[in-house]
């Protein structure tokens, strides 16, 4: 029997880049692709590419990779000090976060990571296995509709913390649908 081993450091990079992609998409950015590779001369082992964002990248997208990586390593409960320590390694993310000057960014990012943890983990598994994921794969992990108006509502529901956005509720066998929080 073949025993498969997992490189946890490379899987952490896949989680990191998947979180940038998923949270970026939730915040309205268009993901081109996310890739992981051997570390380059700057120590980067992956990247997430977005189409041009006229207003820039939201600060929660910059912090998402670090927060998801810590969530992967320590579970949902980790200290703000752990984030500060990790941002010492992820200097690009730290520079973007410091430039935003918003003290509420960490709380918003943690909530988004918890809300979208399943899609992040699913996308990270694909990224770890194949080394690259597309924007379409990000949308598939988020289970977004192919129709723009529906996907816009779904993304808004995710930002609001309701995941999934709607489920069928059939009291007495009727065909009623209503939005509810899960």
Residue ranges and their predicted role:
Residues 2-182:
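Soluble catalytic regions of large protease machineries
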